[in-house]
Amino acid sequence: MILGPDGILNRDTRGDWVRLRTLILLRWMAVAGQLAAIVVTDWYLGVRLPMGLCFMAVGASVIANVIATFVFPQNRRLTEFQALMILLFDLTQLSFLLFLTGGLTNPFALLILAPVTISALALELRTTVILGAIAIGLLTFTAYFHLPLILADGSSLSVPRMFEFGFWLAIVIGILFLGLYSRRVAIEIRSMSDALLATQMALDREQKLTDLGGVVAAAAHELGTPLATIKLVSSELAEELSEQPALRDDAELIREQADRCRDILRSMGRAGKDDLQMRQAPLGEVLREAAEPHVGRGKRVEFDLYPSRGGDERQPVILRRPEVIHGLRNLIQNAVDFARSTVWIDGEWTGDRIAIRIVDDGEGYPPAIIGRIGDPFVRQRRAEESQSRRPGYEGMGLGLFIAKTLLERSGAELSFANAADPFLRSHERPERCGAIVEVIWPVDRLVVVRNAPLGENVLIQT
């Protein structure tokens, strides 16, 4: 994986994603189509084509494919320049065929869109612009310079200049439109893939930390007896070596280090104990656990938990799922980062849903992008404002995307809004005047069912 400043994957390496085998297969399809069109046109329609030159043009593609197949490995990844050269060869070969077969009077001139579309989907913008400009240039050349199509009666096929110009204009517009549209779709797919990869990495990290805690707890339990034995033996040696100060000091040092190991394992075991009972907790405890890393960052974090109409007075006991904690933590981090002084975390529950609202007293979300919050790589703040509040933060919206994806995976619905009009004056704004995030779960997706089994039975070996 190649890291870069523009995201998870450096955009400059996109050409490395194109496989040579993919372009070879596409070229074989083009060769088959060209041969079929040439044979049908000459034999069935009776159009007189320069068959030798046409087969020579198609043969050039066949030779290039055979060389690429036998010389290079099938899993060869192409650089940006190599992919450009291959597509440029295909574009030139197709233009030569159009030159031989009537230019724009040949309806297959539409196929000149294919190399540009492939470039827009797989390569960089600069490469696509170059290839598109060359395609328009070659198309214009074949419009003026081409061999006429000779029909069976010996006459040449001609079309009105207005029709030929309209066909040329349609293909040029198609090159521009399909290039831009395909480019936009490719960027959206790549951004979403990168953000989903980052989400999966964050969730995997959280899961590994949880698993590591269980391993540490087990290690602390298993090492308890050996450490107790070491401490007992070292204490007895220290008493017996009272007349040999040097050896006695060594025995006491061993005992002290055994005590130190015991204390370390005990603290780690408490932090990472993977008891099934600890996989569930009251709603308030889960919210405090999610907010814990950001409570001491100079902003006041207030919790308010209450039942709504029809809700039980007791807090619901919910699952401590890693994606829920990590997602809420990202939302709380964003609120703390941009709050002036206070962040409010409200928990509300009824008989069929659980709602959590995170509100701050900052400036709120920019109105221009509030409908796009949660999309990957959306810049939410100006660079200078973001840097003053969050040093080293580039504001790409990836944190909110990760939070949104993780929480939606757990069955939640998220909504983003501003608590007050961002254009109000400071003295006119209410206390809760910043951004609002509301997360709502159906009860059955989050609440622990009473009397339900905690997990699979563990085989007890004797």
Swiss-Prot record:
Subcellular localization: Cell inner membrane
Membrane-spanning segments: 26-45, 52-70, 79-96, 104-123, 130-149, 165-182
Keyword field: ATP-binding, Cell inner membrane, Cell membrane, Kinase, Membrane, Nucleotide-binding, Phosphoprotein, Transferase, Transmembrane, Transmembrane helix, Two-component regulatory system
Topological domains annotated Extracellular: 46-51, 97-103, 150-164
Enzyme Commission code: 2.7.13.3
CDD domains according to UniProt: HisKA
SMART domains according to UniProt: HATPase_c, HisKA
Catalytic activity: ATP + protein L-histidine = ADP + protein N-phospho-L-histidine
Residues on Cytoplasmic side: 1-25, 71-78, 124-129, 183-462
NCBIfam families attached to this UniProt entry: ActS_PrrB_HisK, HisKinRegBRhodob
The protein, known as: Sensor histidine kinase RegB
Species whose genome carries this gene: Cereibacter sphaeroides (strain ATCC 17023 / DSM 158 / JCM 6121 / CCUG 31486 / LMG 2827 / NBRC 12203 / NCIMB 8253 / ATH 2.4.1.)
Record gene name: regB
